[in-house]
Curated annotation (Swiss-Prot):
Organism: Lepidochelys kempii (Kemp's ridley sea turtle)
Task performed by this protein: Rathke gland secretions may function as pheromones, as predator repellents, or contribute to the maintenance of the turtle shell.
Locations listed in the record: Secreted
Keyword Glycoprotein: yes
Alphabetically ordered keywords of this record: Glycoprotein, Secreted
This protein's name: Rathke gland glycoprotein
Transmembrane segments: none
Post-translational modification: Glycosylated.
Length: 30
């Protein structure tokens, strides 16, 4: 799947970036 431009919801609010799957958690890289 293409994760570029994915909007990731975090405790700080929605963040746009590339979603990377790390372990069982998803982080956002720019």
């Amino acid at each position: 799947s293409d994760d570029d431009g994915t909007v990731v919801l975090t405790t700080s609010g929605p963040i746009r970036g590339k979603r990377l799957q790390v372990g069982s958690a998803a982080v956002t890289a720019f």
